[in-house]
C-alpha cells in the first residue's frame, strides 16, 4: 500500500514530457550561476512544483527537497557572455548582425584573401588561379548594378567621415538609414553623393545627441560647409526629420575632455548652462560659443584656467565670440569672476 503514491507520482512524471526537453538558454550574462525555474515539472519525492535547472552543475533539481531529477543536462546556450542586448546581438553565433552601413546589409559572403586551405596549408598554383577568378566574380555579384555601386560608394564615404570624426556605431547606422531613405525617395538626383552622405551624417549626429558642427563635418568630408547645410535642410524637409535645436550642454563633455579639464569643471559648466537656459540666454546664439564661454568661466572659477585661445581652438569659434558670451553669462547670472 505504501508504494501507491510513488507509482502515482511516477505516472505524473511520465506524463510531463517537458522534463526531458532542452530549453534554449539565451541569457548568458550570469552563466556561472544559472537557476531556471520550470513550473510544469513535479518532484516524484515530495510533489513540489518548485523545480529549477542548474546549468552550473548540469542538473534538474527540486528546490524544496533537493531531489535530483536529471543529471548531465546539456546547456544549449552560447559559450560567450553578454551584458546587454547590443552585445548579445553582436555575439550571436548565427553570423554577424545585420548592418545598414554595408550596401547589402552584411548578408552576402566574401571569399577570404588568404590562399590557404582549411588546415592552413598553401594551395597549389591551379587552385590559386581558380580562387582569383572566384573572388573577382564574387565582387561583381555583390555589386550588380549602378545603383548598388553608388550606394556602396556612399556608405564607404559615410564610414570614412565617421571614422575621421570618431563617431560611434549608432550614429553610423542612423546616418546609413537616412541615406537609404533619401535614395528611395529619389533625393540624390542632381546632388553629389558626398554631399548627401555628409548631410545624413550631420543629421544623425543631431538625432543621436552626439553633436558635431557643420565645420567639423565639412573638414572630414570633401564638401564645403554651405553645400552640406543646404543639402541637410533639403533632406530634413523631404524626409520629415524633426530635430530640436542643439543644446550647448551636449558639447561640454567633448570640449572639457579635449581641454583635459577635471569633472568638477565640466559639472560647473553644465550648471551655468542650465541656469542660462532658464533665463533664455542660449536661444538665438551659437551653441558652441555659449558652451565654450561656460567652460571658460568654470575653468577660471575652479582654478584650472584655460586661455580663451585654447578654448576657442577646441570649440571652433573665435575669441571675440567667447568674450561676448562670457560677458552675457557673467552679467545676467551674477557670476563674480576674478581674472
From Swiss-Prot:
Cellular component per GO, a single term: transcription preinitiation complex
Source taxon at top rank: Archaea
Residues annotated for Zn(2+) binding in this entry: 43, 46, 62, 65
Any one Gene Ontology molecular-function term assigned to this protein's record: DNA-binding transcription factor activity
First and last residues of each zinc finger (TFIIB-type): 39-70
InterPro entries reported for this sequence: Cyclin-like_dom, Cyclin-like_sf, TFIIB, TFIIB_arc, TFIIB_CS, TFIIB_cyclin, Znf_TFIIB
Sequence repeats: 156-239, 250-331
Keywords tagged on the record: Metal-binding, Repeat, Transcription, Transcription regulation, Zinc, Zinc-finger
GO process annotations (BP): transcription preinitiation complex assembly
Presence of the UniProt keyword Metal-binding in the record: yes
Functional description taken from the UniProt entry: Stabilizes TBP binding to an archaeal box-A promoter. Also responsible for recruiting RNA polymerase II to the pre-initiation complex (DNA-TBP-TFIIB).
Family in the record: Belongs to the TFIIB family.
NCBIfam families noted in UniProt: PRK00423.1
Protein name: Transcription initiation factor IIB
Lineage: Archaea, Methanobacteriati, Methanobacteriota, Methanomada group, Methanococci
